[in-house]
């Protein structure tokens, strides 16, 4: 009887396959504006219970935050107005915990120059870091069939600080550097409107740029 592969994250015996990123990110036909099934040809990696089924609440948190993010494309917005809205009606506790910190802000689109009012809210940074770390490790395993045992550092490109403008300037510099670095690197993923990624491999590290709903981007650095 063939043995299952070990967990992509911790190396324990795998008990199932984990979708990378979580399947919840990808709309079913009834939740997509064109009736398309975005759940075809998804990436899967072997995982133990602790790094798959036990993190289902984190999957839902990621879905809420990504679809509510300002850079999300029309698919992400539609997914929020369908699947996420139904979930909110059934289980309102999560959305209440997210929007309790909401602040009305005015933003400017640096590409068009248009200005408009919207809401900003505080996210659970540590929770998102853990979620994106899992995804980055999953992508690494998918690409190499080996488990990454080094460190993973993630940066959400659209995140902003209301208290430290210097942090925002630093983040902006990192995003511009990422734009230059990943320019010309092909996008991978069968459903790019929902999720795709870019990867650059070096001998001792690799960089992965995650794209959710078009422009909700996260840079992950995998280094020893």
PLM regions: where:
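N-terminal alpha-helical interaction blocks
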Residues: 1-2
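C-terminal, charged low-complexity interaction regions
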Residues: 113-224
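Short Fe-S-cluster ligation motifs
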Residues: 34-49, 77-92
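Amphipathic alpha-helical interaction segments
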Residues: 54-62, 72, 142, 146
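Histidine-centered nuclease catalytic patch
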Residues: 6-44, 60-61
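Short flanking/linker segments adjacent to small metal-binding domains or redox-active Cys/His motifs
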Residues: 86-123
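Short Cys/His-centered divalent metal-binding micro-motifs
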Residues: 41-65
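A broadly used, surface-exposed interaction patch
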Residues: 51, 66-79
């Amino acid at each position: 009887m063939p043995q299952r592969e070990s967990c992509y994250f911790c190396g324990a015996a795998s008990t199932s396959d984990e979708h990378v990123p979580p399947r919840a990110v990808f709309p079913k036909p009834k939740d997509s504006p064109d009736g398309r099934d975005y759940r075809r040809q998804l990436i899967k990696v072997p995982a133990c219970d602790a790094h798959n089924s036990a993190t289902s609440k984190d999957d839902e948190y990621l879905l809420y935050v990504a679809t509510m993010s300002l850079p999300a494309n029309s698919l992400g917005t539609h997914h929020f107005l369908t699947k996420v809205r139904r979930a909110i009606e059934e289980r309102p506790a999560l959305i209440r915990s997210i929007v309790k910190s909401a602040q009305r802000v005015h933003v400017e689109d640096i590409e068009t120059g248009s200005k408009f009012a919207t809401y900003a809210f505080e996210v659970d940074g540590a929770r998102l870091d853990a979620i994106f770390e899992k995804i980055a490790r999953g992508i690494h395993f998918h690409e190499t069939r080996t488990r990454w045992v080094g460190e993973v550092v993630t940066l959400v490109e659209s995140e902003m600080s209301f208290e430290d403008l210097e942090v925002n300037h630093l983040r902006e510099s990192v995003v511009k550097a990422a734009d230059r670095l990943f320019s010309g690197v092909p996008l991978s993923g069968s459903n790019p409107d929902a999720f795709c990624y870019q990867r650059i491999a070096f001998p001792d590290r690799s960089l992965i740029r995650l794209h959710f709903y078009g422009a909700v981007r996260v840079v992950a650095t995998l280094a020893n």
